[in-house]
Amino acid sequence: MPASNRATLAVIIVAKNEAADIGDCIRSVRDWADDVIVFDSGSTDGTQDICRQLGARVFETDWPGYGEQSNRALREARTDWVLSLDADERISPELRAEMIAVLESGSTHTVYSMPRSSSFCGRFMKHSGWWPDRIRRFFKREQVTFFDAPVHSHLVFDGTVGDFRAPIIHYSIPDLKAALDKANDYSTAGAAAAYAKGKRASLGSAIGHGLWAFVRTYIIQRGFLDGAEGFMLAVSNAEGTYYRYIKLMMLHRHGKQIGRASCRERV
């Protein structure tokens, strides 16, 4: 149980159909967080039941976008600090100790960043642009809001940023099916956002940007040091980039999207 002489902490999670992951996510924080808040946009796989069984407060809502859904969860929090997690993330014991130290001793920082250790098809990547992948997820509740973006939301705040050393553990892409689904989802959302801004694309730009995505991931970001998974990730990034530009081109030609958009945050 949380100590009574420290600042309080709420964990907020935005989810849909995360039954395979969200239990372990909540278990990594429930013994030391004061509150766990889950905003669910219509799960049909038992996600909500799992969350309630583990003591989380669950709110079922529509899907207004990444930033607004996170802001809804943030508005339900009543604690001094907030930790925002995805269902496929876990807090390591080392990171937990760093966070508790801040809660116990206080801090002048508004937000803390931390590295994220992400797995691709069973391998935790050390290159390929996936490490250290610092993210800002731990913050003072009253001084931060979320800003919406096509496939990610980010924090808006005034103040300084502190750094944790230990990582969040991120079970990002478990298999090739998930990699293909993510490439499709993100390319659809990215094309829609570019279309809304009046941007255009051609077959040549799709091929060029796709090839560059592979070179950047595999060569410049040293994905070759991540073994077979590094090559697979580079191909996946190239594919997603190529299809983002192709879908943008098709939007201008036909006025309709091809593929499906993701309905959950993956950061």
Regions found by a protein language model. Give the residues of each.
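Conserved small/polar residues in nucleotide/adenosyl-binding loops
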Residues: 261-267
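Catalytic metal- and UDP-sugar-binding loop of GT-A-like glycosyltransferases, i.e.
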Residues: 61, 85-87
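Conserved donor nucleotide-binding strand/loop of the catalytic core
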Residues: 48-76
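A conserved acidic beta->alpha catalytic loop
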Residues: 28, 32, 40-52, 86
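Conserved beta-strand segments of alpha/beta enzyme cores
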Residues: 35, 57, 160-162
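N-proximal low-complexity "stem/linker" segments adjacent to membrane-targeting elements
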Residues: 1-28
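Acidic helix N-cap motif at the loop->helix transition within catalytic regions
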Residues: 23, 45-54, 94-95
